[in-house]
A protein has these predicted regions:
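Acidic, glycine-rich loop-and-strand cores that form catalytic or ligand-binding grooves
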Residues: 195-262, 266
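Extracellular and analogous surface-interaction loops
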Residues: 74, 79-82, 87-98, 127-135, ...
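Extracellular beta-strand-rich recognition modules
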Residues: 98-104, 136-143, 169-171, 271, ...
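Secretome/extracellular-domain signature
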Residues: 119-224
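GGW-centered surface loops in extracellular recognition modules
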Residues: 45-108, 167, 175
Length: 391
């Protein structure tokens, strides 16, 4: 899919009690269906947002305290993240409703005998959660699987409570094999089977192996299966599988790739992806999990390392509504969504909001459309007859 959206912003002036409708045009110029979601958000109290990254770490092991200290220097996270075995611990600063957005990591690419294939993309999961000041969250940010003659599985991205209860998990993408692409992370809890290969894990468990010696992805609770090495579950530290010189799985439970142009590794996730079979195609994508409200879940969307964004939510918006919040736009087609601005219950002043458009376009998956509205009084001009004015 290839998304095109107009307009890119709204700047409107309304009289008190006026209602105004404007159109948002969503066009798909790509060669596959475009899946999209629209969400209104209020700029009034937004801005309190915390973004957790892989701290520039790559490979099967997570970042160190020093690497994350350097990454977050000068940000709102400086001095507030403690790293233990690559897992980042953060204390919630204020009670409230938070939106947590997580992305699984991409699988590694393959290049064998002049044939190049790409790893599967990571899933995106988003939900709202009530958090308390002082509450500890454990955050594991998945890392991209290693690219070689075969690809390692991408790591899943996890957010859990201090007692290790999962809140939200985004599955990584499977590693590419010598003859085919890796399979993307999915929004369902079960990991996917590797292409003609091992079964994906279920109920938070690791995936299985098929023919060959690649490693399956791990789940939240149990490790991924492997003949050599093996990826570790979230509860066991989340290390990606890395036996010998084979392509390592990414941190977050990614399984290793195998051989020279062999099978791709399974991805980590809530449940792990399986490995590919004897056809040496791609590894399976990781499963995902979301216990939040107002969910936005999209499979196969992230082409990079994982990321976690936690945002203190703003109050609901009463003066703006959308005619549709989700849809599928076919190839070469256009969809129209109506934005209604309603100043009926507003006082004179300036109001700001935004529209977040999230899609499966890999090059432009998240678009913000700002809304600026000024409300003024409607002044009525009355003609006065000069003859009626007494001196």
């Amino acid at each position: 899919p290839d998304i095109s959206v107009t307009p890119d912003s709204f700047d409107e002036i309304l009289f008190v009690d006026e209602v105004l409708n404007r159109e948002i045009i969503i066009q798909n110029d790509g060669v596959a269906d475009l899946n999209w979601n629209l969400n209104l958000f209020n700029y009034g109290r937004d801005g309190t947002s915390y973004t957790f990254t892989n701290c520039d770490k790559e490979g099967n092991e997570g970042p160190s305290q020093e690497e994350c200290d350097s990454e977050y220097q000068g940000t709102m996270l400086e001095g507030f993240v403690t790293v233990d075995g690559g897992i980042q611990q953060w204390i919630v600063p204020a009670s409230g409703t938070y939106t947590i957005d997580v992305h699984g990591a991409k699988g590694g690419d393959s290049n064998w005998s002049g044939n190049a294939y790409v790893g599967g993309l990571g899933a995106k999961m988003q939900g709202q959660f009530a958090l308390e000041a002082g509450q500890i969250l454990n955050i594991l940010v998945g890392q991209v699987g290693t690219s070689s003659s075969e690809g390692g599985g991408g790591g899943g991205t996890y957010v859990a409570k201090a007692d290790e209860t999962p809140l939200i998990v985004a599955g990584g993408g499977g590693g590419a094999g010598g003859t085919g692409d890796g399979i993307g992370g999915v929004t369902e809890t079960s990991g996917t089977d590797g292409a003609a290969g091992g079964a994906g894990g279920v109920d938070g468990n690791g995936g299985s192996v098929g023919s060959g010696n690649a490693g399956a992805g791990s789940g939240f609770y149990t490790d991924g299966a492997a003949n050599y090495g093996g990826s570790k579950s979230y509860l066991n530290g989340g290390t990606g599988s890395s036996p010998g010189n084979w392509a390592a799985g990414g941190f977050g439970g990614g399984g290793h790739g195998w051989g020279s142009g062999g099978n791709g590794g399974g991805a980590g996730g809530y449940s792990g992806g399986g490995t590919s079979g004897a056809s040496y195609i791609g590894g399976g994508g990781g499963g995902s999990f979301n216990s939040g409200l107002d969910q936005i879940n999209i499979a196969s969307v992230n082409a990079d390392h994982g990321v976690v964004t936690i945002t203190l939510d703003s109050p609901p918006i009463s003066w703006a509504t959308l005619s549709d919040n989700a849809g599928v736009t076919g190839v070469g087609e256009v969809d129209t969504v109506t934005l209604a601005l309603d100043a009926s219950d507003l006082e004179m002043g300036e109001y700001s909001a935004g529209i977040s458009l999230i899609s499966n376009d890999p090059d432009d998956p998240d678009i913000d459309i700002p809304i600026s509205m000024t409300v003024i009084y409607d002044v009525e001009i009355v003609d006065i007859d000069d003859a009626s004015i007494e001196e």
